[in-house]
Curated annotation (Swiss-Prot):
CDD domains for the chain: FabZ
Family indicated by similarity: Belongs to the thioester dehydratase family. FabZ subfamily.
Subcellular location: Cytoplasm
InterPro entries on file: FabA_FabZ, FabZ, HotDog_dom_sf
Function per UniProt: Involved in unsaturated fatty acids biosynthesis. Catalyzes the dehydration of short chain beta-hydroxyacyl-ACPs and long chain saturated and unsaturated beta-hydroxyacyl-ACPs.
GO cellular component: cytoplasm; membrane
Protein's UniProt keywords contain Cytoplasm: yes
Reaction(s) the record says it catalyses: a (3R)-hydroxyacyl-[ACP] = a (2E)-enoyl-[ACP] + H2O
Protein's name in the database: 3-hydroxyacyl-[acyl-carrier-protein] dehydratase FabZ
Keyword vocabulary terms for this entry: Cytoplasm, Lipid A biosynthesis, Lipid biosynthesis, Lipid metabolism, Lyase
Entry EC number(s): 4.2.1.59
């Protein structure tokens, strides 16, 4: 899935669109996406100027955006249909390594459960096959606006 396709499934735009490409997607089960980290991103002007590292919350947000694409594709919807997926919970977050400009984040998400409209996902972000961040995320669908 190209960036143009990604933009059809996420309402986010620059500088907060954190998915560059989807490599794999299995409806209702899993997604693998990429985020290319570059020095030109605005967070690096303050985090930290002498040693730029991607904030952990931005890594979690990238994972959350991957969950949104998976949920939209699984439910055959899009944000233009008046619906959005909102992050409603984060559990078991661990940060193991730093992410620096030039890294490519591989975002891997699997559906754990779907109960009463709440999706629960097992997520991990890796760089060069090393785990950077792991977490369980929850999201639900809401009407936009």
């Amino acid at each position: 899935m190209s960036i143009q396709d990604v933009k059809n499934y996420l309402p986010h735009r620059y500088p907060f669109l954190l998915i560059d490409r989807v490599l794999e997607l299995e409806i209702g089960k899993s997604i693998v996406a990429l985020k290319n980290v570059t020095f030109n991103e605005p967070q690096f002007t303050g985090h930290f100027p002498e040693q730029p590292i991607m904030p952990g919350v931005m890594i979690v947000e990238a994972l959350a955006q991957a969950t949104g694409i998976l949920a939209f594709k699984s439910e055959a919807g899009k944000p233009i249909d008046g619906q959005i997926y909102m992050l409603v919970g984060i559990d078991k977050v661990r940060f193991k390594r730093m992410v620096e400009p030039g890294d490519q984040l591989r975002l891997e998400v699997e559906v754990i459960t779907i109960k009463r409209g709440i999706w629960k996902f097992k997520c991990k972000a890796t760089v060069d096959n090393q785990i950077i961040t792991s977490a369980e995320l929850m999201c639900t669908q809401r009407t936009a606006g």
